[in-house]
């Protein structure tokens, strides 16, 4: 019984986040509440093969900074982060 409580406590430190790209491709992450978003951004960029500095990450319509964490953004389990690729120029 004590093991169940300890395990539930460990799970409470983590959050599941879904990152959705422009092409509707989904990447799921399980991170700690205190993990910096810079780490998640880099991991997403590595998985998709795109340079992290050309990507824009948004949560609830607001841009995510590298020093943000799921805790500072008040994220909950299964929240969605949207990813857009930077566009330059055009008419």
UniProtKB/Swiss-Prot annotation:
Protein name: Small ubiquitin-related modifier
Traits of the deletion mutant: RNAi-mediated knockdown reduces survival. RNAi-mediated knockdown disrupts tail tip morphogenesis resulting in retention of the pointed larval tail tip in adult males (also known as the Lep phenotype). RNAi-mediated knockdown causes chromosome misalignment and anaphase bridges during the first embryonic mitotic division. RNAi-mediated knockdown results in impaired locomotion in 23% of animals. RNAi-mediated knockdown results in ectopic expression of egl-17 in multiple vulva precursor cells and a moderate increase in phosphorylation of mpk-1.
Protein modification: Cleavage of precursor form by ulp-1 is necessary for function.
Record organism: Caenorhabditis elegans
Propiece span(s): 91
InterPro entries the record matches: Rad60/SUMO-like_dom, SUMO1_Ubl, Ubiquitin-like_dom, Ubiquitin-like_domsf
Location(s) in or outside the cell: Cytoplasm; Nucleus; Cytoplasm, Cytoskeleton, Spindle; Chromosome
UniProt keyword annotation of Signal present: no
GO BP term, example: negative regulation of DNA-templated transcription
Recorded GO CC terms: centrosome; chromosome; cytoplasm; nucleus; spindle
Cross-link (Glycyl lysine isopeptide (Gly-Lys) (interchain with K-? in acceptor proteins)): 90
Gene Ontology molecular function: any one: protein tag activity
CDD domains, per the entry: Ubl_SUMO1
This protein's record includes keyword Membrane: no
Domain Ubiquitin-like: 13-91
Pfam families, A to Z: Rad60-SLD
Function: Ubiquitin-like protein which can be covalently attached to target lysines as a monomer. Does not seem to be involved in protein degradation and may function as an antagonist of ubiquitin in the degradation process. Plays a role in a number of cellular processes such as nuclear transport, DNA replication and repair, mitosis and signal transduction. Covalent attachment to its substrates requires prior activation by the E1 complex aos-1-uba-2 and linkage to the E2 enzyme ubc-9, and can be promoted by an E3 ligase such as gei-17.
Subunit text: Covalently attached to tbx-2. Covalently attached to lin-1. Covalently attached to lin-11. Covalently attached to sop-2. Covalently attached to bet-1.
